[in-house]
Amino acid sequence: MTRRLKSGADLDAIGSRIRELRGSVHQQELAAELGISQGQLSKIERGKLGPTADLLIKLVERFGGSSDWILTGRR
């Protein structure tokens, strides 16, 4: 079963896009920059937990791009 946010967004796909953004940056390093635990980032990347709006903003500020792409895959 695909996990989804209330908006209908697919958590597995969101997690994959966040992992893609992270690239070669270690989870622990990025988590510290974002102000979350490594475990929380791991859950988000595995689609077990959805990102907060605050986290989406921080990811866009850190890597560029858009929150739309993170949430929907549309550029």
Regions inferred by a protein language model and the residue ranges of each:
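A short, Lys/Arg-rich alpha-helix, primarily the initiator
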Residues: M1-V25
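Short amphipathic recognition helices of helix-turn-helix/homeodomain-type DNA-binding modules
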Residues: T2, W69-R75
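Residues within the helices of the helix-turn-helix
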Residues: R19, Q28, I57
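Short alpha-helical DNA-recognition segment
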Residues: G23-R46
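Residue-level detection of the helix-turn-helix DNA-binding "recognition helix"
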Residues: R46-K48, I57, E61, R75
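Amphipathic, hydrophobic secondary-structure cores in small proteins
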Residues: G47, P51-T52, I70
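DNA major-groove recognition helix of helix-turn-helix/homeodomain DNA-binding modules
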Residues: D54-W69
